[in-house]
Amino acid sequence: MENKEIVLDELKYLYTEGYIFGDIAHFHDTYTYEDNGVNKAYFELSEDEELEVLEEYVKYRKQRRLLNE
């Protein structure tokens, strides 16, 4: 599995509602100090890959919100 997919899947698994900025900050704080596959994938992302993950995550959250309305 590609690093982007690992990180995006973890974001989708952990954070499905609430404030996106808070979710991203919490994710960063959590995976800065953990030593696991998600941590390694997260820190191997390039800047472009990080943006792609964020774009996909925001798109996912928008779709979930629209489905719940």
Q: Language model features by range: what are they?
A:
Residues 1-69:
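Structural boundary micro-motifs
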